[in-house]
A protein has these predicted regions:
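Extracellular glycan-modifying ectodomains
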Residues: 1-260
Length: 260
């Protein structure tokens, strides 16, 4: 929506974002620029995104200040709420499996000596578990991750059957940044009677939501189908399990893991 005119400095920032998003043929022009840079000038990096073997990667560096903030925040939560039983699980960056950098290794090394109960999932995943045009993991490839989490939580794993629902026009966040023509990914979301019956309460919106918001598949960010995207505080109620509670401090990677 066009930004409201109010007496503060945010209007022009919002206007700039609005015009950028509503510029006619904006993505087409970006793809032409990306095509010329990549195919004519052999420039394989655009907006800190590069391509290797028909797969897009976001170039990054280890931010030790951010890691220190994570350690401090975890310590604060543990102390404030007197938590004794917790696990810290790190999902590796996709770059790790393409040998583009050592960021995941540096994160594991740094946090591994500063945090108790730190677990890396590097050995459980591979490049094929990630989308080609996005940074995230494919939900249908998360079996080993879910098994590891259940093991850490001392919960018996059960055989659960899912229906596989697919959408074959998923262009991830890295696609828009790289701005070159590529085949889309296929995004899959798993359902069964249990997941269909579960409701997700959004504290910030004060609303009951479904586990999957299928309408998001037609949005600019189809990955938001999982748990309705970047919500700050969600409560998932499973009436079949009343004697256990799991609290997750998450980022977007966990959106597709938590329902499982």
């Amino acid at each position: 929506a066009f930004p409201k005119i109010i007496d503060n400095n945010n209007f022009f920032d919002d206007l700039d974002k609005y015009l950028s998003d509503h510029f006619i043929f904006r993505q087409d022009f970006r793809e032409v620029k990306g095509f010329v840079n990549y195919n004519l000038f052999n420039i394989s990096i655009n907006n800190k995104v590069t391509i290797k073997d028909d797969c897009l990667f976001e170039l990054t560096e280890t931010n030790y200040k951010s890691l220190d903030n994570i350690v401090a925040k975890v310590d604060e939560i543990i102390t404030r709420f007197d938590i004794n039983d917790y696990e810290f699980i790190a999902i590796p960056l996709k770059n790790h499996y393409a040998g583009l950098d050592n960021v995941s290794e540096e994160i594991d090394e740094y946090l591994g000596v500063r945090m108790d109960n730190y677990h890396s999932l590097k050995d459980l995943l591979s490049l094929s578990d990630y989308y080609r045009t996005d940074i995230h993991l494919k939900q249908e490839r998360l079996g080993s991750v879910v098994s590891k989490i259940l093991e850490l939580c001392d919960v018996e794993e059960k055989d659960i059957e899912y229906s596989f629902n697919t959408y074959d026009k998923f262009y991830g966040s890295l696609y828009a940044k790289m701005a070159i023509s590529m085949k889309p990914d296929t995004i899959t979301y798993l359902t069964n009677d249990l997941l269909n019956s579960i409701k997700v309460y959004s504290v910030e919106d004060k609303d009951l939501l479904d586990v999957y918001n299928v309408s998001e598949l037609e949005s600019l960010d189809p990955y938001s189908i999982y748990l309705n995207g970047p919500k700050a505080y969600l409560k998932i109620v499973n009436k079949n399990v009343e004697d256990r509670k799991l609290i997750i401090f998450r980022d977007s990677y966990t959106s597709s893991i938590a329902p499982l």
